[in-house]
């Protein structure tokens, strides 16, 4: 994705402007904050037992992000371009949150054939534990539930079908698409959609800037150093969140500014 960094990556402020102005691209992907004042739902997991937890996270911040995006899409009413009636909003997760699931993960098409062996003798021939997914569309009946097995490859399959793209792997090539989520011939107007009220998100705790980075945060900072530091070999990963935030702003802050 590096070749598209200066063309296809934008800030959340610009995203909301595009929603309001009806200028969203055909496909937009929102990545939550995963470093400092997180809103990605991901807990700041300890590095090992009895090791202090670095960072800070509050699931209410993730709920607020989902609320703000949904509310912006619901309010978009431009005559041309993107608007609430022609935008499909999909909210999904890459992990199940370590919650128990009584349904055993089913088998799945391997990405390749033959499929090379992965870690722990795994051949990628089975799906993982179920994750929640919310689909919002003016052409989806309120309260609809899809009970058949669908995995993340369905998103890629849907995009490939809609835009006549080649599949990435056998997994997404044989995946079901999301077409059965579109159940209405006439749209439900946004005035009939729910109006959720988000819970108040408290500010980050005092001293957050002095907390250590967890493994995910170290990876994010390390990638930024490797790509954008003029001397990557001489630039160390900072030990605290505050120092990491300052470094990231120095390395990549201006790269989101578009002419």
Each language-model region and where it sits:
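N-terminal pro-sequences and low-complexity stem/linker regions of secreted or lumenal proteins
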Residues: 1-259
């Amino acid at each position: 994705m590096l070749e598209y960094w200066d063309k296809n990556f934008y800030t959340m402020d610009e995203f909301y402007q595009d929603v309001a102005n009806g200028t969203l691209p055909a496909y937009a992907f929102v990545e939550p904050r995963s470093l400092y004042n997180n809103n990605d739902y991901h807990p700041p997991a300890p590095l090992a037992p009895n090791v202090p937890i670095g960072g800070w996270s509050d699931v209410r911040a993730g709920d607020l992000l989902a609320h703000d995006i949904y509310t912006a899409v619901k309010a978009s009413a431009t005559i041309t371009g993107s608007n609430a009636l022609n935008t499909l909003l999909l909210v999904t997760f890459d992990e199940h949150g370590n919650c128990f699931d009584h349904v055993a993960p089913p088998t799945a098409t391997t990405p390749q054939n033959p499929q090379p062996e992965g870690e722990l003798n795994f051949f990628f021939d089975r799906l993982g534990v179920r994750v929640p997914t919310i689909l919002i569309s003016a052409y989806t009946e309120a309260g609809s539930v899809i009970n058949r097995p669908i995995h993340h490859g369905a998103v890629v399959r849907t995009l490939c079908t809609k835009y006549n793209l080649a599949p990435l792997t056998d997994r997404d090539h044989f995946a079901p698409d999301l077409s059965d989520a579109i159940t209405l011939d006439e749209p439900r107007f946004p005035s009939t959609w729910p109006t959720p009220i988000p819970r108040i998100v408290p500010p980050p705790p005092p001293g957050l800037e002095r907390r250590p980075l967890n493994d995910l945060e170290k990876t994010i900072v390390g990638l930024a150093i490797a790509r954008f530091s003029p001397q990557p070999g001489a630039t160390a990963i900072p030990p605290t969140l505050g120092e990491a935030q300052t470094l990231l702003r120095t390395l990549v802050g201006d790269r989101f500014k578009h002419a």
